[in-house]
């Protein structure tokens, strides 16, 4: 990347720096050509831990953080169903959905009518199809969002936060949100990490205009996801059941 591009991208600071996204697109065309591109993924701890694991921009090592503060530029459902109980490996789910409406794979079809998407189809009263939510979070001073795969145990708190913002006329991509973790316990007595959401501030008019372009770009990116996008080369523990699962990118 040329010095000129670096200088142009750095003209504005914070979220307003995104006003230089035309320069960023040019830089990406140069630096990412021929590469398989995906956004960095935040990892949730097992056993009720309260620190996120975030990929470092400076090295291959991850950084531990007590909170993530940024703009949720886009979010969508991320459903994953495995016919056989996942025990490890680099295999995608048998069926996945990124809109919560239509499943891709086997059995596929209408998610609302799918028997695997009903409470009680899994262990206890859980669903065989894991219902998650993918959040794309843009932190201040950065040009790419990071992704957080929100597990079922955190969906209620996220839903309540969304409702609280909408009731005040605020869209998620117009506010700065702070996300932390607290230890919770499910009905089976298994501890897991539950996300907590808090409003920090409204974006300025300049920031909102800049972030809107990122939201559209991320939305287009998400529209091209397939069940194979659920593959990851590392396994995690399901924070609700303690099972080894395939995490979402």
Where do the model's predicted regions map?
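A broad, low-amplitude sensor of folded, mature protein cores
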Residues: 3-9, 14, 114, 162-179, ...
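Long, highly charged low-complexity segments enriched in Glu/Asp and Lys/Arg with interspersed Ser/Thr
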Residues: 83, 91, 187-249
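Residues that form generic nucleotide/phosphate-binding pockets
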Residues: 27, 31, 161-164, 214
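OB-fold ssDNA-binding interfaces and closely related basic DNA-contact patches used
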Residues: 1-141, 248-249
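Short glycine-rich, low-complexity/disordered patches
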Residues: 40-42, 87-96, 129-130, 173-179, ...
């Amino acid at each position: 990347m040329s010095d000129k591009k670096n200088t142009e991208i750095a003209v504005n600071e914070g979220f307003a720096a995104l006003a230089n996204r035309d320069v960023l697109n040019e830089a990406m065309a140069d630096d990412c050509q021929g590469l398989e591109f995906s956004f960095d993924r935040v990892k949730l701890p097992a056993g009720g831990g309260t620190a996120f694991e975030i990929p470092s921009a400076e090295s291959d090592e991850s950084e531990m953080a007590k909170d993530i503060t940024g703009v949720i530029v886009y979010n969508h459902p991320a459903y994953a169903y495995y016919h056989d109980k996942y025990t490890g490996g680099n295999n995608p789910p048998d069926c996945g959905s990124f809109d919560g409406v239509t499943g891709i794979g086997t059995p596929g079809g209408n998610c609302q009518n799918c028997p695997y998407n009903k409470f009680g189809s899994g262990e206890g009263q859980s669903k065989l199809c894991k219902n998650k939510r993918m959040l794309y979070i843009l932190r201040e001073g950065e040009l790419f969002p990071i992704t957080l795969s929100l597990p079922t145990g955190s969906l209620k708190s996220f839903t309540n936060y969304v409702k609280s913002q909408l009731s005040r006329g605020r869209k998620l991509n117009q506010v700065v949100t702070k996300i932390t973790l607290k230890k919770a316990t499910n009905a089976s007595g298994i501890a897991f990490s539950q996300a907590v959401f808090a409003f920090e501030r409204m974006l300025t008019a300049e920031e909102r205009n800049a972030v809107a372009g990122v939201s559209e770009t991320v939305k287009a990116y998400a529209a091209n996801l397939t069940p194979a996008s659920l593959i990851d080369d590392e396994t995690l523990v399901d924070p609700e059941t303690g099972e080894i699962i395939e995490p979402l990118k």
